[in-house]
């Protein structure tokens, strides 16, 4: 069963798939891992680590932006 935070991230992924398919497709490939100690979010290209308290403060558009931002790290390999 998904947490409310995971649902928020999944909803943002779906929105990206509909609005920006490239970003949405890449975002769906990242495995979600809760990691409060990182403070925000990060990726290594296979995982998306996130701090639940940070995600909780974001509105839906900000959550979509965060996912697109993390996906760009993957796309640009940095």
Identify the meaning behind each predicted range.
Residues 1-67, 71-78:
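Basic/hydrophobic alpha-helical interface regions
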